[in-house]
Amino acid sequence: MSASREKNKRKEEAAAPAAANEAKKGMSKGLKTTLIAVCAVLIVCIVVFFYMLTSGFFASHTTAATVGTHKLTPAMVNYFYKGAYGNMQNQYGDFMSYVIDSDTPLDEQVYDEESGETWADYFTDQGLINASNAYALYDAAKADGHTLSEDEQASIDSQISSLALYASYYGTNTSGYIAGVYGTGCNEKNFREYLEVVTLADSYATATQNGFIYTDEQIASEYAANPNSYDAVTYRQFLVSDAMFQTDSTDTEDDDAEAEAETLSDEELTALKEELASKMAADTQRDEQAFIDQAYENCLESAKETYAEDSATLKENQLYSSLSTDVADWLFDAGRAEGDTTYIATDSVYYVLYFVSRSTNDYQLPNVRHILFSVSDTTDETAMDEARTKAEDVLTEYEAGDKTAESFGELAKEYTADSNGDEGGLYENIMPGQMVTEFNDWCFDADRKPGDTGIIETSYGVHVMYFDSFGKIYRDALVENALRSADYNAWYDATAGDGSYTTSAFGMKYTTK
């Protein structure tokens, strides 16, 4: 190899590493820039994701369930979930604690042992069924041109305002308070939407129900076809039970009696009940006083004080629907006559019955106004005395005026603590047993006439009463209610649907339980 060629080779070899280094240096710069950009994007995405996660974005923007054509966000599902829980709470009241442990999360409390379903699952299901029904009615209302009344819209605004007041008290804003109560993603906007849906649905359902009107001919035809459904019976009843043939410490005068009660077989107890019931029915036929006397003689010693009253066995104006089938069928038999007696066996007791009378319920129902002075604890005599004084003062004010229904109504608007103040304290077509006993007895007093006034006391406080007028025939009201109920139920089933829904596993993750 010549000297020149060797020199050139060394130059090429020296140049090669330099070129490689230049190439390497250029790739590192580009890669570094790319990596920085990718990392920046990832960081932004992570920040945005966690913001969306913690701010309730997913709870208010994803789909958790679908009812009909409506996609419900997790936040909307939360509202119906809480609504289902509230419905049960209203139904059970103080007994709710016997069903659900308030100190344990609902998704940790089993509702159905066989399926493993929790109470959280139950309320989710009930809430979504309610949502399906509500949105179906909401859509029907929209299609029918039904809108919220001014009062209904004002009620929604009032609920929002109340939450704003609570929020202010707790040092937060309205949406923050709503989220705290109902769950992440819940805010003032979607809560108002929820209220508008359920309020319009309820309003439309109520308007539809009230819209079913019936003619006198329709009412008469229904009564003629089903008189047992609308008549009432008065009768006497005595129950023969196992306890009457077993020794009980409360029914013996022997203080030294320590022996256990004699144990009788089921067959022996049944035979004894049959014997007593059949004898009492046979011995008291056509003799109401004999029935009263034998009830007293046969009852437990611990019940003697109760059965000393003639009214102990009396059942007045009972409807067929309020009785067991066997008892109702005998009492409402077309051939039943006053003084008829019988006995009817059930699994646990024997009914001894004495038929008194049957009524066609063809009397008028009372329309009554009242002014309530509410007392939270009616055992508090100081509070009751204050309420009595106020009631007497208002009655005096009424009597000093023109003493009309209208003037009483104006006083009711001013003074009553009842929710019907805007209607002048008026209750129309009051059904027997609709009101508490004292209120009911005053309304249905046989001597009551329009213009009568009085003061009564109930568990609600002190009432100033005014008998306004007589309303519908009771029988006709019963028939109307039955027809309306049947027609409304048919309409509701057809309009509200079957409560079907679908859920999205991803969206349901963001619901609050």
Could you tell me what each predicted segment is?
Residues 8, 12, 18-39, 46-60, ...:
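PPIase-associated folding chaperone regions across multiple families
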Residues 56-189:
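N-terminal targeting/tethering segments
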Residues 73-74, 85-91, 95, 245-251, ...:
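Short, solvent-exposed loop/turn elements at domain surfaces
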Residues 81-84, 88, 131, 135, ...:
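Sec/Tat-exported extracytoplasmic proteins
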Residues 98, 122, 159, 177, ...:
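Charge-rich, solvent-exposed alpha-helical interaction surfaces
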Residues 151, 155, 214, 218, ...:
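Alpha-helix N-cap and coil->helix boundary residues
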Residues 275-327, 393-437, 468:
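Peptidyl-prolyl cis-trans isomerase
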